[in-house]
């Protein structure tokens, strides 16, 4: 019987995009404050939605802090709620 040729594994490709920089670390922020609107706006899209971790490069704990701060700022009417879709 004839032996089957061995398959070799494909080389592992490098990631297509470089790792995102952590925005909070680059800003030098240790605590997130809901009153700091200018910093919180960097984590909100133009429609008012909270940007995902994939986009911002934050850790899980930092993303939770940002989300809580944005929600508190919305309650205090410092930031807008997400805009509804135009019809």
From Swiss-Prot:
InterPro entries, sorted: Ribosomal_bS18, Ribosomal_bS18_CS, Ribosomal_bS18_sf
GO molecular function: small ribosomal subunit rRNA binding; structural constituent of ribosome
A GO-annotated cellular component: cytosolic small ribosomal subunit
Domain of life: Bacteria
Signal peptide as annotated in the record: none
Gene Ontology BP, a term: translation
Keywords of this entry: Ribonucleoprotein, Ribosomal protein, RNA-binding, rRNA-binding
Family classification: Belongs to the bacterial ribosomal protein bS18 family.
Primary role: Binds as a heterodimer with protein bS6 to the central domain of the 16S rRNA, where it helps stabilize the platform of the 30S subunit.
Subunit structure of this chain's protein: Part of the 30S ribosomal subunit. Forms a tight heterodimer with protein bS6.
Protein name: Small ribosomal subunit protein bS18B
Biological source species: Mycobacterium marinum (strain ATCC BAA-535 / M)
Gene this chain is encoded by: rpsR2
